[in-house]
């Protein structure tokens, strides 16, 4: 797993890079920075899939029209950070769709205009707890958050005009 992550890290600093990843196991530490426009980390047809406990995942996309699509099937005691800087990016997260995400923490930060986030947590009957922080700065952003877990906590900081927040 470490060798794969290292090879990804050397190639993510150019525009139009596509990353597809499937990881299962305990203790994953993953950091990806994509700089440039039209980058992808997964797609709606081929999502990144993460499953395990004690994962630390930090994904940053800097530039316009970037895409991220991830399924985090199970992730107890895990921490995810997603930062997007630029306009017209699109991110989709399905968290806890098939397992527990107890003690999980998700931080989302968007700076720019016309960003779309779809975040669904806890569709599995076994999903519990969740702590989400959403920071949105810019105009015309569309944030859709659904949390179906016991003990879900969402915190918001939103600034800018014409932002659409649905929970």
Tell me what each language-model feature is.
Residues 1-167:
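Long, low-complexity, polar and repeat-rich extracellular regions
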């Amino acid at each position: 797993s470490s060798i794969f992550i290292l090879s990804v890290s050397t190639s993510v600093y150019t525009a139009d890079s596509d990353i597809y990843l499937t990881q299962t196991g305990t203790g994953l530490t993953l950091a990806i920075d994509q700089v440039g426009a039209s980058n992808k980390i997964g797609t709606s047809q081929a999502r990144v899939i993460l499953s395990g406990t004690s994962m630390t995942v930090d994904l940053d996309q800097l530039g316009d029209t970037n895409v991220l699509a991830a399924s985090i099937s199970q992730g107890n005691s895990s921490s995810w950070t997603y930062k997007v800087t630029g306009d017209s990016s699109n991110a989709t997260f399905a968290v806890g769709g098939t397992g527990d995400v107890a003690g999980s923490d998700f931080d989302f930060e968007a700076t720019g205009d016309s960003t779309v986030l779809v975040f669904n947590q806890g569709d599995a009957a076994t999903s519990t707890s969740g702590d989400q922080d959403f920071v949105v700065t810019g105009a015309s952003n569309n944030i859709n958050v659904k949390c179906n877990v016991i003990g879900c906590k969402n915190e918001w900081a939103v600034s800018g005009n014409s932002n659409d927040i649905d929970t």
